[in-house]
């Protein structure tokens, strides 16, 4: 344990590590959460002289939007959808720009485009919610079923795969509950979903020198003469890397959650994720989706840390270790779109390469004759990869020291 604390302090005392943690905190928590809630995403936009076209009043706008959303009742029905559209059109006609910002017009417009494509007018620049006849918005759930069925057919998901997904969808409670959704859409669509891909950059910088740095600092020869031995030190370094990753995640996640609770409260936590994407098949609410996305980021970060430490133990150069580490996560992201779909899905299983937004999708893996919903594997395989790398990290570092 004493050796672990020594390695732990050694890592945290590195200036580059402190800079990485600070920069990532500023980007994720300050800009990505606090300022996004208060200014960038939810500030009112009636003052176009302000930065980003928004005022610094997001807290008040969020509260007013939540109260407005509650006026339509709890269940999403034909009548409540018609009322949402009708009131939006009335406010738009009256020039009530301030009031329009409190509506879920972006979400509702996406519903209309999906459920009522025949009502879309390609000859107008207006969004559908501005011109569609509210009285024609009927059969919401029948149309949703048809939209999901058409989507699966167009995606080539038929037979047992389609049956598997539809059986999952049957567990979604209906009628869907509705309140203000835009806040949760932003939170789950970008604020939390992007956490892992940003962490990857700073984790690579912080951990790529964990083993390779022994040669850079000319301390590798000391390891062979220490009373603890190379194997014990190597295992300690690996544990230190994993511990740092968990601490790094906590430094970002805890303030993020506190910021979310401050600005949004707990309103809407039990809404189904179908409010964000109507044809999502997962029987999950917003809180469950958020827990999944944080777990995805944590387990993916642990898996990626294992990969970075393996690379660091394999090469002697800090620069090469960093470049290979960055290539391990960002390389697959860049080339995936040019590869066959099956290979794209396989690459998604690499640590932090996939997306936690798969909870809104219908992606599956066909393994041993059974279909498995992709989010199940996206949260387990990456951390297993990191753990699997551990013995090879120790072995590779041993070979380097003996060489």
Predicted regions and their residues:
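Short hydrophobic, aromatic-rich alpha-helical segments embedded in or entering the lipid bilayer
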Residues: 344-364
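Secretory targeting signals
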Residues: 26-83, 133-214, 235-314, 318, ...
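Alpha-helical transmembrane segments of multi-pass membrane transporters/translocases
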Residues: 17-20, 300-308, 363-403
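Transmembrane helix boundary and interhelical loop/hinge segments in multi-pass membrane proteins
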Residues: 207-222, 226, 230
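Aromatic- and glycine-rich beta-strand/loop motifs that create alpha-glucan
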Residues: 1-18
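Central hydrophobic cores of alpha-helical transmembrane segments
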Residues: 21-25, 319-332, 350-351
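Membrane-helix interface segments
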Residues: 16, 229-230, 317-322
């Amino acid at each position: 344990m004493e050796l672990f604390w020594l390695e732990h302090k050694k890592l945290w005392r590195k200036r580059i590590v402190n800079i990485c943690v600070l920069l990532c905190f500023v980007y994720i928590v300050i800009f990505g959460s606090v300022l996004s809630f208060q200014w960038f995403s939810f500030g009112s936009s009636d003052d176009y002289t302000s930065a980003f076209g928004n005022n610094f009043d997001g807290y008040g706008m969020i509260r007013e939007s939540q109260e407005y959303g509650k006026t339509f009742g709890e269940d999403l029905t034909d009548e409540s959808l018609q009322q949402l559209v009708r009131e939006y059109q009335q406010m738009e006609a009256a020039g009530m720009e301030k009031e329009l910002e409190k509506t879920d017009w972006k979400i509702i417009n996406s519903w209309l485009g999906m459920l009522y494509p025949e009502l879309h007018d390609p000859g107008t620049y207006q969004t559908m919610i501005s011109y569609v006849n509210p009285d024609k918005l009927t059969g919401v759930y029948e149309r949703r079923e048809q939209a999901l069925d058409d989507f699966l057919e167009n995606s080539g998901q038929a037979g047992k795969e389609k049956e598997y997904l539809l059986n999952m969808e049957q567990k979604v409670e209906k009628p869907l509950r509705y309140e203000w959704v835009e806040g949760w859409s932003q939170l789950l669509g970008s604020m939390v979903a992007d956490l892992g891909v940003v962490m990857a950059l700073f984790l690579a910088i912080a951990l790529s020198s964990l083993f390779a740095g022994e040669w850079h600092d000319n301390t590798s020869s000391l390891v062979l003469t220490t009373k603890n031995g190379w194997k014990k030190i190597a295992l300690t370094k690996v544990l230190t890397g994993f511990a740092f990753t968990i601490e790094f995640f906590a430094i970002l996640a805890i303030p993020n959650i506190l910021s979310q609770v401050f600005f949004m409260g707990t309103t809407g936590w039990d809404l189904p994720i179908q409010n964000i994407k109507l044809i999502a098949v997962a029987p999950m609410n917003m809180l469950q989706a958020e827990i999944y996305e944080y777990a995805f980021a944590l387990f993916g970060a642990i898996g990626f840390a294992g990969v970075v430490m393996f690379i660091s133990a394999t090469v002697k150069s800090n620069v090469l270790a960093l470049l290979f580490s960055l290539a391990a996560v960002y390389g697959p992201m860049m080339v995936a779109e040019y590869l066959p779909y099956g290979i794209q899905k396989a690459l998604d299983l690499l640590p932090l390469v996939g997306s936690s937004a798969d909870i809104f999708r219908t992606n599956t893996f066909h393994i041993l004759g059974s279909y498995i919903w992709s989010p199940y594997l996206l949260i387990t395989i990456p951390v297993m990869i990191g753990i699997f790398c551990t013995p090879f990290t120790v072995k590779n570092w041993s070979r380097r020291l003996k060489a």
